[in-house]
Regions:
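Conserved PLP-enzyme active-site core in the AAT-like
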Residues: 7-16, 76-307
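Short hydrophobic/aromatic beta-strand micro-patches
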Residues: 218, 341-343, 403-405
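Conserved small-domain helix->loop->beta segment predominantly found in fold-type I
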Residues: 268-271, 275-277, 286, 291-293, ...
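N-terminal glycine-rich, Lys/His-bearing helix-loop that initiates the first secondary-structure elements
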Residues: 1-47, 425
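Conserved N-terminal alpha-helix of the aminotransferase class I/II PLP-enzyme fold
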Residues: 30, 35-87, 109-117
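Active-site beta-loop-alpha junctions enriched in small/polar residues
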Residues: 152, 181-183, 319, 345, ...
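PLP-dependent enzyme catalytic core of the Aspartate aminotransferase-like
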Residues: 1, 115, 124, 142, ...
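Short amphipathic alpha-helical segments
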Residues: 48, 74, 276, 280, ...
Length: 425
């Protein structure tokens, strides 16, 4: 099936008992066992079924199946946020003493997780420029458990050469984890370019309406975990915390996502509410239509800003003069979502005047909403970074980030025009 159809139908058919066509909300903590043996078999992973909503839930299962189908994966795990998804994806394969290699241009929360939080747990991150694959590859050693990148960077809007990075990682027997939040599977499917694990913040374009926080981890099911038992011992040796199960034996190609569910999620508990899963599923049904309008509007806004005398610079990979325009053509069909950034003449002071003058575009730090949104990253999402870190992340202090919505483009541009005029002071 095509993506547009999968987004509506994958993972669910009318309920056999009630004949309900919409996905039901299974708002329950627990699920009954047929008998003692059934309960034991569920806990031993011998049979499929529901145990407890911290680990699995039928509403969440539909979302997981649907997202796995859209990305082309073997399985998925829905969790409470995109940050939980990234954390659990890393913790599934890495432990104290290990490291991951990551591009430096990242969402501020992700950078903070990798640079400051995970090191306190003994997992180090080694950063290099997103466009220097050789430098990234050079950081991989025997304790590297994954390479990490964003398909489209937030907020910089940079495009990563996924195929080249995947090849570099695979030369060393290491998987590539790609955060595909900004691109969504409508614009880019990282597994088709060699990625092994995909994560999303479902809060953004997937949900699409700013109503629900959620995240997901998706497993391609193609990485040969069992071929390197020493590097990936967590997947290849008996786990004393879960009845001595060996995940590559119990789950086969889905070993990664199996361990992700029964270790990080089960033990740390960032479970997605079934109600949030239901709301995200509603948004997912219109994802393809919305992305078409998002990208169309973003290109119009980018052209408008580029021609405005009050604008110092514009970064949007959909513009022909962007240094990564060819990568945008290759990986997103020339439609690199609707996150763009620009600088206003007059620096941070003028930028603040611009933000304060907006009337239609909403001042907040989310992206991927049906509504157009604006923020000043250096004072919000990336506030915790020092000047050196801001430079590495591609976030100058005069940057304004726009997430272009699906309103009429004329109205978006009219609001930007009056705010730019106000920025003059």
């Amino acid at each position: 099936m095509k993506l547009e159809t999968l987004a509506i139908h994958a993972g669910f058919s009318p309920d056999p008992t009630t004949k309900a066509v919409a996905v039901p909300i299974y708002q329950t903590t627990s699920f009954a066992f047929d008998d003692t043996q059934h309960g034991a078999d569920l806990f031993d992973l011998k049979v499929a079924g529901n145990i407890y909503s911290r680990i699995m839930n039928p509403t969440n299962d539909v979302l997981e199946q649907r997202m796995a189908a859209l990305e082309g994966g073997v399985g998925a795990l829905a969790v409470a946020s995109g940050m939980a998804a990234i954390t659990y994806a890393i913790q599934t394969v890495a432990e104290a003493g290990d490291n991951i290699v990551s591009v430096a241009k990242l969402y501020g929360g992700t950078y903070n997780l990798l640079a400051h939080t995970l090191p306190r747990m003994g997992i180090q991150t080694r950063f290099a420029a997103h466009d220097d694959v050789a430098a990234l590859e050079g950081l991989i050693d025997a304790r590297t458990k994954a390479v990490f990148c964003e398909s489209i960077g937030n907020p910089a809007g940079n495009i990563v050469d996924i195929a080249a990075l995947a090849e570099a990682a695979h030369r060393h027997g290491v998987p590539l984890i790609v955060d595909n939040t900004v691109a969504t599977p409508v614009l880019c499917r990282p597994f088709e370019h060699g990625a092994d694990i995909v994560v999303h913040s479902l809060t953004k374009y997937i949900g699409g309406h700013g109503t629900s926080i959620g995240g997901i981890v998706i497993d391609a099911g193609t990485f040969p975990w069992a071929d390197n038992k020493e590097r990936f011992a967590l997947l290849n040796t008996p786990d004393p915390s879960y009845h001595g199960v060996t995940y590559t034996e119990a789950f086969g190609p889905a070993a990664f996502i199996g361990r992700c569910r029964v270790v990080p999620l089960r033990n740390m508990g960032a479970a997605l509410s079934p109600f949030n899963a239901f709301l995200i599923l509603q948004g997912l049904e219109t994802l393809a239509l919305r992305m078409e309008r998002h990208t169309e509007n973003a290109l119009k806004v980018a052209h408008y800003l580029q021609a405005h005398e009050q604008v110092a610079w514009v970064k949007y990979a959909g513009l022909p003069d962007h240094p990564e325009h060819q990568l945008a053509q290759r990986y997103t069909g020339g439609k690199p979502a609707s996150i763009l950034s620009f600088g206003i003449k007059g620096g941070q002071v003028a930028g603040a005047r611009f933000i304060d003058a907006l009337q239609l575009v909403v001042r907040l730090v989310n992206i991927g909403d049906a509504k157009s949104l604006a923020c000043h990253p250096a004072s919000t999402t990336h506030r915790q970074l020092n000047d050196e870190e801001l430079e590495k992340a591609g976030v100058p202090r005069d940057m304004v980030r726009l997430s272009i919505g699906i309103e009429h483009s004329d109205d978006i541009i009219a609001d930007l025009a009056q705010a730019l005029e106000a920025s003059r002071g």
